[in-house]
């Protein structure tokens, strides 16, 4: 028999207050014409440099890699696409580990399948990598980064990862500061490989590394710095607009039980897409994510079951008239929630893209149903579901199935109905991304959640169903995360079912799980590492 929720105290979580308050309200600087002209002049110089570099040459490979890592490749999408296609179509023989690894990574990043057999020349008769390679630090680093583009059953790349990780850890501990640029690059890579790093974070860290590299191109470096600072101004202005919206709602006071994390939500979405053309989409998606966070905390950290039943019904009805059926304290949030989607409809109806909002609403309804399912389990005498049942629900309740669809709504590109239908059917790349976020979140957060009477996590369900220890459950989940990354890599191989820019949104969303959930739940506990990351991307400009 279900326990009476009326007799239960509210499951308050006592989240810490906002780190940022209304700090970004004052960031209203516009990008000047002089800044635009200077960036455009550098851009044309760099474009000419890229086009004139011989096709397939080491010079072109190194240049493209630097552009991508410095965060300016979005300016040269077509030129880079053509260059990588040419490299893939006419591969050149090379026995330089650095160049072979770099070419492999660039080609796979672009969605072309290049066989990992290209690394066989660096192995001995036993299939092990030759010990002589340990003298080539740059080559080891490039092979290490390439190994993160592996898919399932690529044993040579598994061997490559183990081999390079072992030797790079040993080498970096003994490297002198004379090689400081390379030492920093190796240390950073061992902590966070390129494939798993958010593009803005990679740009910020690589600008410093690249500047200290004696072989750097000073024009490209200057361009990257100017572009970073110009984009930062745009992002600050967007966050200023969003902060005004958030302040006007006054939800920090109306919903003190919820995590007040507007800036963190924006940073999350900035990870999904940072380019100027996605400004409208970023603001739309940040509002959706912020309201989702309030709804999530209402389910997890405040409302009773008797309050959540009509609230879930109201979301499923998606009707302003349903507002009278929900508790008074929920009504401002429900109205603001409806208003966000109405605003989307007003903007997109003028562009003939109203169908996008239909799919976004569907995903949000599905997400709230998943929240409610967890509430039902908890209300049913703390029912612990079977692991497989919990997994299917958790892949939805983590939000990583809602975001890929909703983040497309405000984008300028043509996106077909077929693409939205594809997303609705939970494709492998979206399931893999959802699994990564859910597993990482549960590993760092499940013990705290259990202390405040949260529904059993996937960790607890796995331990119960399979008689596993906590450490065994952690090991299983970490292995699942590794395999999910391999599935994401495979889904990028051409021909793809949907445009590459759609897959890139899912990839970047997955990358966002790293800073949010790698060591702790940094969204919930936002005072430490995440605060520093936000500071480096959204406050501190790069010194020219």
From Swiss-Prot:
This enzyme's EC code(s): 4.2.3.71
Cell compartments where the protein resides: Cytoplasm
A cellular component term, taken from the record's GO annotations: cytoplasm
BP-aspect Gene Ontology terms: diterpenoid biosynthetic process
Keyword vocabulary terms for this entry: Cytoplasm, Lyase, Magnesium, Manganese, Metal-binding
Recorded catalytic activity of this chain's protein: (2E,6E)-farnesyl diphosphate = (1E,4E)-germacrene B + diphosphate
Family, as annotated: Belongs to the terpene synthase family.
Function statement: Involved in the biosynthesis of germacrene B.
Protein name as annotated: (E,E)-germacrene B synthase
Originating organism: Solanum habrochaites
């Amino acid at each position: 028999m279900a326990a009476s929720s009326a007799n239960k105290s509210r499951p308050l979580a006592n989240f810490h207050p906002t780190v940022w308050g209304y700090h970004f309200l004052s960031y209203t600087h516009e990008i000047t014409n002089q800044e635009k002209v200077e960036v455009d002049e550098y851009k044309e110089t760099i474009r000419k440099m890229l086009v004139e570099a011989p096709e397939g040459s080491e010079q072109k490979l190194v240049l493209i890699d630097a552009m991508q890592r410095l965060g300016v490749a979005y300016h040269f999408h077509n030129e880079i696409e053509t260059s990588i296609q040419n490299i893939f179509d006419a591969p050149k023989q090379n026995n330089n580990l650095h160049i072979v690894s770099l070419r492999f990574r660039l080609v796979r990043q672009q969605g072309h399948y290049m066989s990992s057999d290209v690394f066989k020349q660096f192995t001995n008769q036993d299939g092990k990598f030759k010990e002589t390679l340990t003298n080539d630090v740059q080559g080891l680093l490039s092979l290490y980064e390439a190994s993160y583009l592996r898919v399932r059953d690529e044993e040579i790349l598994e061997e490559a990862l183990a081999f390079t990780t072992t030797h790079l850890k040993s080498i970096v501990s003994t490297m002198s500061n004379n090689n400081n640029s390379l030492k920093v690059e190796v240390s950073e890579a061992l902590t966070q490989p390129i494939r798993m790093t958010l593009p803005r974070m990679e740009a910020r860290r690589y600008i410093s590394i690249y500047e200290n590299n004696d072989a750097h191109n000073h024009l490209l470096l200057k361009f990257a710095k100017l572009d970073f600072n110009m984009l930062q101004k745009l992002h600050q202005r967007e966050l200023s607009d969003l902060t005004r919206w958030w302040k006007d709602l006054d939800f920090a006071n109306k919903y003190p039980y919820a995590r007040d994390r507007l800036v963190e939500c924006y940073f999350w979405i900035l990870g999904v897409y940072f380019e100027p053309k996605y400004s409208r989409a970023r603001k739309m998606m940040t509002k959706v994510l912020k309201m989702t966070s309030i709804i999530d905390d209402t389910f997890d950290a405040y409302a009773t079951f008797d309050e959540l039943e009509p609230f879930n019904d109201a979301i499923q009805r998606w009707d302003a008239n349903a507002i009278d059926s929900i508790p008074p304290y929920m009504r401002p949030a429900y109205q603001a929630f409806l208003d966000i989607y109405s605003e989307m409809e007003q903007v997109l109806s003028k562009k003939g893209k109203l169908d996008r909002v239909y799919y976004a609403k569907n995903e949000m309804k599905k997400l709230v149903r998943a929240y409610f399912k967890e509430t039902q389990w908890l209300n049913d005498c703390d029912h612990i579901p079977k692991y497989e049942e919990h997994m299917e629900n958790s892949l939805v309740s983590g939000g990583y199935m809602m975001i890929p669809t909703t983040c497309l709504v405000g984008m300028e590109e043509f996106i077909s109905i077929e693409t939205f239908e594809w997303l609705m059917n939970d494709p492998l790349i979206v399931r893999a991304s959802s699994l990564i976020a859910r597993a990482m979140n549960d590993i760092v957060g499940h013990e705290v959640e259990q202390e405040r009477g949260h529904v059993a996590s996937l960790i607890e369900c796995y331990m119960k169903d399979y008689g596993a220890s906590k450490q065994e459950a952690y090991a299983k989940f970490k292995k699942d995360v590794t395999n999910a990354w391999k599935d994401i890599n495979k889904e990028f191989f051409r021909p793809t079912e949907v445009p590459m820019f759609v897959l890139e949104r899912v990839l970047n969303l997955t990358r966002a799980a790293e800073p949010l959930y790698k060591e702790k739940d940094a969204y919930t506990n936002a005072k430490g590492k995440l605060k520093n990351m936000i500071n480096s991307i959204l406050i501190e400009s790069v010194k020219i």
